[in-house]
Amino acid sequence: MVLSSELLASILAEVRPLLGQGKVADYIPALAQVPADRLGMAVCTVEGELFTAGDAFEPFSIQSISKALSLTLALTLYQEEEIWARVGKEPSGQPFNSLVQLEFEQGIPRNPFINAGALVVSDLLETRLTAPRQRTLELVRRLSGNPAIMADQVVARSEYQHSARNAAIAYLMKAYGNFENEVDKVLQSYFNACAIRMSCVDLARAFIYLANRGVPLGAGEPLLPARTTKQVNALLATCGLYDEAGDFAYRVGMPGKSGVGGGIMALIPGELCVCVWSPELNKAGNSLAGTAALELLAERLGRSIF
């Protein structure tokens, strides 16, 4: 089938009956207030064409999707070996906020997309930047072409007030010598990134560089080298959807990154970036209807990286 807004609308209509079968994230009180019936989808091609359906323009909390943006920012500031000396490149097979594996592996997180790994990346940003929160916002505004993007401070505060487990993860890494800055300061920057509000359209545009050999939408110069972009995509394919990455690869067949706000970003290198949003999550913490929508999109377009 040919990519069109009508195709996206038909896919959303097909997955809409799934609404009510998942559960909105409630361990972050501010996220629990998001209406469960929201459903949106946007696709941006490497040529800049945009296709939308449903609530594609409504901003939501990107949560762990921000981990891919933070890693990108770190890769512009550090030699890659400096990053991979402190965080691994392997799937975890454990819950995203697990302490058990971290203890067993002496404070080196499995990958940059679980909480421990993202906290190490945030620690790296804190070391190298005087204003990491502002630099992260500047990056997403530039990549998406939307200067109005902000972090929701109500969500950020809500996460900070319920941050005992993330603090425990950070202090455990500090005990193993894998955390340089004040834990409290890094946590606040980390939660601020998670609390950034973007729409499906914003995200589909922002991540097009991963589908375009490192070159952002409308830019001449690459943000990342093509080789590094390929490596980030490999990590997204193996680690981007918590401990459901294998099932997502099997069903959808695209590199992707999810967040407990209900968003999923996925891409086909050389072609397009897609973002879908539905706040109700499955047991693995990924959008239930969103995953189904991406599976249908891959099927209808006959596209996969495999």
From Swiss-Prot:
Keyword ATP-binding set for record: no
GO biological process: glutamate biosynthetic process; glutamine catabolic process
Record field: catalytic activity: L-glutamine + H2O = L-glutamate + NH4(+)
Primary enzyme class: hydrolase
Family, similarity comment: Belongs to the glutaminase family.
Name of this chain's protein: Glutaminase
Subunit note: Homotetramer.
Record key words, sorted: Hydrolase
E.C. numbers: 3.5.1.2
Alphabetized GO MF terms: glutaminase activity
Entry annotated with the keyword Hydrolase: yes
Binding residues for substrate: 64, 115, 159, 166, 190, 242, 260
